[in-house]
Structure formats: structure tokens, C-alpha cells
A protein has these predicted regions:
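N-terminal extension/subdomain marker
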Residues: 1-136, 174
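A sequence-level detector for short glycine-anchored, His/Arg-bearing signature motifs
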Residues: 93, 135, 149-152, 156-159, ...
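A short, charged helix-loop
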Residues: 126-155
């Protein structure tokens, strides 16, 4: 209800869909989103098989991102950006009560230094939500990560993952290239 799926970007009723998204945002702003998290949300999704997938939900500085071909910021896409899809997405953002652009960020973290240490301390975190996902998607739960020490730990892990030394060690064939901290 809060996003315009790509399949509908060029539909004739896209404007109506955007209006519905804005109405849903207004509803969520007053009825659902009752607490802002000043930090990250640690998320665990338990699949039907029992496998637990961990992640962090947070915000990124768009000044550290570029989709331009040849650009080498710390955060960049793993594939070409389809620029024709940007205007319909901007239509959703114009007049929106919430900022809800979303992307999956990927970190090459073989040492498990970013997410897993937070998960090891989830008992110390305040649980924000928990529930079953639809269509056999499993179970999901989220915890607020607001402790200054944990936030510093996340920042340090990201800095280490984005260091030239770590990048050169992981990717000797690209030694000296601008490090990629997060891929979109």
C-alpha cells in the first residue's frame, strides 16, 4: 500500500494508484507508525524451512550514492539503473506524507562483522514488531537498535568494510579501485 510496484509504473491508472498510496501514507502516519527509531532496526525473518535470515533496516546518505555510469561512490548499484522509471517514482514522492523509497543493500561481509554482532545482542533490544508473513513467507520480527555503542559498532563495521585495505584484500584483481561499501 505504500509503494508503486514496477509492474504498474506505466499503467493508465498510475495517478490513481499514487493517490491511494498517499492516502495509505496518511493513515499509516497517524495509526501505524507510532514510534520513530533513532538508529536501525535489526530484522530476523524465519523461513518455513527454519532458516533465519538477518538484516538491518536503516537510512543511507544519498550523497554517498550515484547510479551514473562510471561513478565510484561508496554506495552504488550492482546493475544499470533504468532512468525511465525515475519520474513515476518521483510522482509518488511529490506530496507524500512519508519517505518510503526502498532498496536492498548488500554488503560483502565474509567475517560477519555488520549484522551478526547485533543479532547476538537482540535480547538487549526493544522488540518493535513480530508476525507471520503472507503466502508462506515465514515469520518476521524487528528490534530497535538505538544504543550508542551498537550504532558505533555498525559505523565501524561499515567503515572497515569500505576501507581500501579490506577492498584490496577481498578483490585483488581490482586492487586500488575505489572501494564499494554497499551495493544496491
Amino acid at each position: 500500500r505504500l509503494i508503486l510496484p514496477e509492474v504498474y509504473l506505466e499503467d493508465e491508472d498510475a495517478a490513481r494508484r499514487v493517490e491511494n498510496i498517499h492516502a495509505a501514507m496518511d493513515e499509516y502516519s497517524s495509526d501505524v507508525l507510532t514510534r520513530a527509531v533513532d538508529g536501525f532496526v535489526y530484522v530476523e525473518r524465519t523461513e518455513q524451512s527454519g532458516r533465519v535470515r538477518q538484516g538491518l533496516v536503516g537510512k543511507i546518505d544519498l550523497e554517498a550514492y550515484s547510479y551514473e555510469k562510471g561513478a565510484r561512490p561508496a554506495i552504488r548499484p550492482s546493475e544499470r539503473t533504468v532512468t525511465e522509471r525515475i519520474p513515476p517514482r518521483m510522482a509518488v514522492r511529490r506530496g507524500a506524507a512519508l519517505e518510503t523509497p526502498h532498496v536492498m543493500m548488500l554488503a560483502d561481509d565474509p567475517g560477519c562483522t555488520l549484522v551478526e554482532p547485533i543479532g547476538a545482542h537482540k535480547s538487549e533490544l526493544k522488540k518493535l514488531y513480530e508476525g507471520e508473513l503472507m503466502q508462506g513467507g515465514g515469520h518476521i520480527a524487528g528490534w530497535a537498535v538505538e544504543d550508542p555503542a551498537m550504532l558505533a559498532q555498525i559505523d565501524a563495521a561499515l567503515a572497515a568494510l569500505g576501507s581500501q585495505e579490506a577492498f584490496d584484500a577481498k578483490y585483488p584483481q581490482a586492487k586500488g579501485a575505489k572501494p564499494l561499501t554497499l551495493a544496491v
